[in-house]
Amino acid sequence: MQQRQRWFGVIALLFLIVIAYADRVNIAVMLVNPDFLQHFQLGGDRAHQGTLMTVFLLGYGLSAMLLTPFLETLMGYRRALTLSVVLWALLTAASPLAGSLLLLCVVRALLGVSEGPLFSLKTMYISDHFAADERGKPNAVSALGVSLGLVIGFPLVSFLMAHFGWAMSFHLLALFNLLLGLMLVRLFVHPLALSSSSRPADPQPVLSRVWHTFALAWRTPMLGWILLIEIATLSYLWGSSAWLPAYLTDEKGFSIKQMGWMAALPFIVSIASKYLGGALLDRIRPYQAPLIFVFGGAATALCIYGVMNSHQLGWIAFFLLAANACWGVQGAAIPTLLQHYARPEAVGSAYGLINGIGNLFSAFVPMAMGMVMASQGKVSSGFAVLIASQLLTLLAGGALFSRMLLARQVKRA
C-alpha cells in the first residue's frame, strides 16, 4: 500500500475514535442535567452516577479481552470495525428508551461490549501497514482521537442537550456515529493483501484457532508491567473525564455552556503532547520508552495535587492543562511497546488483553471517586484517586525500564 493510502487509514481510525469518545462522554455531561437525573432518579447520588460509567467499562473491558481474539482470528479488522460501528450506534439510540436505571445500566454495558475491540483493531491495522521503527507516529496520531473526542464531545453534547433535550441528543449522536463511522471504515480502512484478515482458510476448528491466538497474546514478554501502566493510564482518563464536568459546575460555578468548553480545554492540550510523545518514540530506543511513564507520571501527579489545592481560577486552569499535557505524552508508548514484543499474528489480541483488563480495573475508578466525594463533601477530593493512578504509572514505568535495560545488557553480553 502506498504511503498516502496507509495514512488515510490512520486518519480514518483517528476520527472513528473521535466519534466513539464523543459518544462515551455524553453520560458525564448528562450528569449535570436535572431532567436526566430526575428521569433516572439519580439526583444527589454520586456513587450511582459513577456506576453508569463503571458498567460501560466493565462491558468494554470484557469485550476487549475476550471478543478480540475471535474478531482477529475470524473477521479481520475491517469487517470487525463495521460490525462494531453498527452495534454501538443502535445501542446509543436505545439509551433514552430505557425505563429505569437498571435498564440504562444494561444498555451502557452492552454499549461497552460493542466498543471494546476498537483499540485492538486499530493496533492491528498499524502493525499491518507500518514497520517496527515507524509505528510511534501512527500510534500517536490515531490515539489523538481520544483527546479530540473529549474536546469535541463535551461541547457537542452540551450543545445538543441544551437545544434538543437530553433524550434527542442520544438519537442525534447515534445517527452521526452510524453515517460517519461506516463511511470512514468502508472508504479508508483496507487490509494488506497478505494480512491475517485475508489468509487462506485454516482447516483447524474455529475454537482451536481462537485459543491459539489468545495463548500467543498471553505469552507476550513484559505483558504484566505494560498492563499495570495501562490500568493507571485508563484510570486517569476515565476518572478525569467522568467527573470534570461536575467539578466545573458544582464546585466552581460554571454554567453548562461554559462547562462544555472548559472541560474540553485540558484535552486540547493533550493533543499536541500525544503527537510529541509519538515523535519522541521514533527517535529513542525501545528500552528507553518506559522513561516517558516515569517522568510523565510524576509530573501529572504533581499537577493534579496543584488542582486540588489551588483556589484561584488561573492556577486551577494551569494545573488542569499541565496535567493533561503530561498524561498525554505517555499515550503512544503503550501500543508501541506492545507492538515491539507481541507476535504479529496476535498483536490485536495482546492489546485487547491489556486494554480489556485495564478497563475492567479502571471501571471502578469513577465510582470510587464518587464515594470519596460523598464522604468528603467536595468533588475535588476525589481527584486523589487520579494522583494514586499516576504514582502507579511512575513505579511500573521504572520497573519496566529496569527489566528492559537488563534484558538488553544480557542480550549484548
Feature names for model-found ranges:
Residues 28-29, 221-275, 331, 335:
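Extracytoplasmic gate region of multi-pass secondary transporters
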Residues 107-147:
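Cytoplasmic helix-loop-helix junction between adjacent transmembrane helices
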Residues 63-76, 275-286, 373:
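Helix-to-loop junctions at the C-terminal end of transmembrane segments
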